[in-house]
Amino acid sequence: MLETTKNLALSVYFMLPSCVPATGLDESGAVLEAEQLRPYYQQPRVLGLAELMNSYGTVRADEKILQKICDCTAAGKRIDGHAPFLSGEELNAYIAAGVQSDHECSELHEAMEKLRRGQYIMVREGTAAQNMESLLPLFREPYCSRCMLVTDDKHPGDLLQGGHIDYIIRKAIAAGVDPVVAVRMGTLVPCQYFGLAHSGAVAPGYTADLIVLSDLEQFTVEQVYKNGKLVAQQGRMLHPAALTVDKARFARVFDSFNMDEITPEQLQLKQTGTRQRVICLTPHALLTTEKIVPFCQHPGTAPGVDVAQKIVKLAVFERHHRSGHVGLGFLGNYGLQCGAVASSIAHDSHNLIVAGTNDADMVLAGNTVRKNKGGLAFALNGQVVGELPLTVAGLMSTESAETVEEKLQALKAALKAHGISEDIDAFMTLAFVSLPVIPKLRLNTYGIVDVDAQRIVPAVF
């Protein structure tokens, strides 16, 4: 990625992955220790250590985590945080370890506590996680000098239609924020935070990376300059970069699925009991809640599924080492009334996640993604209704953003027609259900994870 982004009409910087796997209760395709990361700090476009999501291990002085922090600090680079709802003494310990920012704040009191303790706050407004409205009081002095704008995950269609940071600035201005403050939070503050001393402002001695706007209300970008040269106008690149794909050199990336075909037997619940634990989604957020309900069985659906109560079955299949590990659980508020959805985008280990109302469609959707070596799929009544192959590591496509968006919208439309909740993104929200560092419950290949306690809890009991 460093190599292929060298000569673009865009400055691309990187933060090193700090937690692969996210915690000890996760199963990833690789394990990245401090020694593997250390050489990359010499790269000028590597700005530091990315979101330190294992806050549980950090505050308990995990030696491997502390070594990564020490290496990054010694290189004079930034350490980003990821610590939803961390507070009090544990937050103090986390910050004292060297973590300098956080992008997981969904409530104002949480952001204020972290600001008071010296962290920068990244105000997130993406596809699934939308926190700007809750954090609007930060868009003024004295807070705005320590706050910046970020998107986290965002669908290609949202980027094409609304934009990236410019979309958040536009939305903030519409909410009454001073345009100068909004622009500052989207440009100067992040450059100051990441140590990009000659970027982020139109001033003597600064790199001539700038945009020309229609006005400060609509905030329509009319021209883009890179190093003083006009590179885009009226929403189009003047000289688009040619896409080259060396499949021989990156064969491992294009063949990232190492798992056997899914069978119905893998979806059979091993646990028994009279109650079931449901991972309940939260509208426009990544947080989940826990709900305990009587174990349900209805004709035509898998045991534990109750479409009237918006409860579907959930499975995560390990896809990197052919271990055969499968975690099973139940997902609430997803809304799907029939069929099954599968995705190889499943943060952060990106195993294969499948949600559905019946085992047969779950098997079909999962095997469709496996056959395509990654991507998304929707199966209904034994037929594949739609699919989007993502052949680059099971996460990305070599097709244009426009082509990917067209296929994605067709999939999402089909899912909306079959019950997906209006305030839930069918794929983006699902992709975070397996990340065992955002409260309250997650599902990975080991089972349901209680994030706060960092332990596996039963789905049925």
Name the predicted role of every residue range.
Residues 47-186, 191-201, 210-215, 220-234, ...:
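Active-site core of metal-dependent hydrolases
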Residues 16, 83, 318:
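Short beta-strand/turn micro-motifs composed of small residues
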Residues 160-176, 180-461:
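Active-site microenvironment of metallo-dependent hydrolases
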Residues 1-76, 142, 385-388:
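Divalent-metal coordination cores built from histidine and acidic residues
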Residues 11-13, 80, 148, 377:
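A structural signal for isolated positions on well-ordered beta-strands in alpha/beta enzyme cores
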Residues 14, 149, 355-358:
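Residue-level marker for buried hydrophobic side chains located in beta-strands
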Residues 6, 41-42, 73, 95, ...:
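Alpha-helix boundary recognition
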